[in-house]
């Protein structure tokens, strides 16, 4: 709410008239993230133009689908916004209501990505997805845990977890499996709302994934990909130059292929 630029919610559908259940992909599209009122340190804030890497990966997938003429129905949901301080900005202590009616206490405005993803995940229910996968540069905790060469995958089924990791390995994009243990969910409970948008310091990437799980349509196989590490590089090596890497595009393309054959 602090930005002068209105938020946008982009819906892409490769075959809207198809009867089959689609593969639905959700991408975090924070076009610049200052942290809001909970302001980030100045160092490396310029890299936060890359906080839309999840949404960009899905746009890359749709470009590939268009170029190859894939017949599989794919839906992309891209919640896009800036997170900046301002007179109308969300404040720590505010309570907001998500699309599915869940109330969320905002304790840190720099945990904004999970809020826009939550609404997009809830919105996906109208498409009755065969699978639901979200991509996001979601947590610094994931970057600290796994470094810059691998993304985290949190999946509700072993099959989807295996498909993502195996297809990622085919194209040089690596994923490490992470838990969605129910006993970790307790610190997300709020005394004034259904959930808090942050929990305790330790295990931050897991808490973020467990927060998102509350918004996944019932009975849908879901995976959350935290790509905070490999989505950006400072190196000038291999096929990459400093900046965004496009991580995830090739994995998603291979994943679509496995559901098409």
Stretches found by the model and what they are:
Residues 1-261:
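A generic structural signal for tightly packed, nonpolar segments enriched in small/aliphatic residues
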